Design a protein with these regions (language model features):
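An active-site-proximal "capping" alpha-helix that borders the catalytic cofactor pocket
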Residues: 98-115
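Active-site recognition of the HExxH zinc-binding catalytic motif
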Residues: 55-69
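Alpha-helix boundary/N-cap detector
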Residues: 3-7, 100, 124, 163
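Intrinsically disordered, low-complexity, basic-enriched segments
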Residues: 26, 30-35
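Pan-zinc metallopeptidase signature
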Residues: 80-84, 88-89, 112-192
C-alpha cells in the first residue's frame, strides 16, 4: 500500500509541475500542509501516516485548482480582500468563504484523484476531510483566540485532547443543542 501511495504522490507532483507548482515534503515540525501561492510551492508534512499524507496533498491540490480559476477573486472576494489586508477584521462572509473553500478543496482533491487514476478510499478520505472542515467551522464559531489547532493534528498520535466540552459550551452558548451534540462535540465520531 505504501508503494502505491508513493506512486500516487509522484503522479500528483507531476501534475503540480505542469501547473507551475513545486512540492516540498518534509518531516520538520515547522512544515504544515499548505500552499504558498506567492512562491508556487505546496508543502506536505511527512509526520502523518502515508494515507493521510496522500489525502492532505490531494486537498492542497484542491486549493490550487480553486485558486487558479479565473472567477476565484469574484467568488471569494472577501477572502481575497482579507488576504491582501491581514489587519482587516474577518467578516462573516470571509469566514463562510474560507469554510466553503475548504469543503470545495476536499471535493476538488477527490476529482483530481479520479482524473489521475489514483485510488482513494472514499470513506476514509471524507472522514479525514470532515475532521479538518470541522476545525475551520469551530475556528469561525469561537474565534482564533480560543482555538487550539494542534489538537486536531495530535489525533494521529492518539492524543484526542481538544477544546473541552465545557469551554466550547461556554463559547457557543447560543448554538443549537442538536447541532452541538451531533456535530461539534464529536466531529471525529460522526460522518456528517
Amino acid at each position: 500500500m505504501t508503494n502505491l501511495i508513493e506512486q500516487s504522490i509522484d503522479k500528483i507532483e507531476s501534475w503540480l509541475a505542469k501547473k507551475g507548482f513545486a512540492l516540498l515534503k518534509s518531516k520538520l515540525p515547522t512544515i504544515q500542509d499548505e500552499v504558498d501561492f506567492e512562491r508556487k510551492v505546496v508543502f506536505l508534512s511527512l509526520r502523518s501516516k502515508p494515507e493521510c499524507q496522500l489525502y492532505s496533498l490531494l486537498h492542497e491540490c484542491g486549493h490550487v485548482v480553486i485558486r487558479t480559476r479565473k472567477d476565484y477573486s469574484i467568488r471569494f472576494a472577501a477572502s481575497v480582500e482579507r488576504e491582501e489586508n491581514p489587519s482587516k477584521n474577518e467578516t462573516n462572509r470571509s469566514i463562510v468563504e474560507q469554510i466553503e473553500e475548504e469543503i470545495l478543496a476536499w471535493r476538488e482533491g477527490q476529482a483530481l484523484a479520479n482524473k489521475l487514476d489514483i485510488y482513494v478510499n472514499d470513506g476514509k478520505y471524507y472522514k479525514y476531510g470532515f475532521r479538518w472542515v470541522m476545525s475551520y467551522i469551530t475556528l469561525g464559531a469561537i474565534g482564533k483566540e480560543h482555538y487550539l489547532p494542534i489538537a486536531f493534528q495530535q489525533e494521529e498520535t492518539n492524543t484526542k485532547k481538544q477544546i473541552t466540552k465545557e469551554e466550547l459550551t461556554r463559547l457557543l452558548d447560543n448554538a443549537h443543542e442538536t447541532c452541538y451534540n451531533q456535530v461539534i462535540a464529536n466531529p471525529l465520531d460522526k460522518d456528517q
